[in-house]
Amino acid sequence: MTSLLTTPSPREELMTTPILQPTEALSPEDGASTALIAVVITVVFLTLLSVVILIFFYLYKNKGSYVTYEPTEGEPSAIVQMESDLAKGSEKEEYFI
């Protein structure tokens, strides 16, 4: 009964926190599984990073590549065709509903 009444020494009180308590060494199996998990996480991270970099370079390289169907400025046939289309547009058109 005397052990219940005695107060622990200050050194023993400090050891009650989980950080300061002595830890057991990892077994070789636990160390190997920890290393395997670290390798898998690293490979996944590097794969995602490389995919993001490839997408960035692809989008940067193909920026602004589109085709317009507008006639060029110097084509006289296109200008004449546009003028004839404008002349047709001035006529009154009827729409039946």
From Swiss-Prot:
Extracellular domain ranges by topology: 1-36
Residues annotated as glycosylated: 2-3, 6-7, 9, 16-17, 23
Record membrane topology: Single-pass type III membrane protein
Post-translational modification: O-glycosylated. The O-glycan is modified with sialic acid residues.
Transmembrane segments: 37-57
UniProtKB keywords: Cell membrane, Cytoplasmic vesicle, Glycoprotein, Membrane, Sialic acid, Transmembrane, Transmembrane helix
Cytoplasmic side: 58-97
Keyword Membrane: yes
Gene Ontology CC terms: cell junction; cytoplasmic vesicle membrane; nucleoplasm; plasma membrane
Intrachain disulfide bonds: none
Tissue: Detected in breast, endometrium, colon and biliary tract. Detected in polarized epithelial structures characterized by cell-cell adhesion (at protein level).
Signal peptide limits: none
Superkingdom of the source species: Eukaryota
Compartments where located: Cell membrane; Cytoplasmic vesicle membrane
Coiled-coil spans in chain: none
General function of this protein: May play a role in epithelial cell-cell contacts. May play a role in tumor invasiveness and metastasis formation.
UniProt family annotation: Belongs to the SMAGP family.
PANTHER family: SMALL CELL ADHESION GLYCOPROTEIN
Name under which the protein is recorded: Small cell adhesion glycoprotein
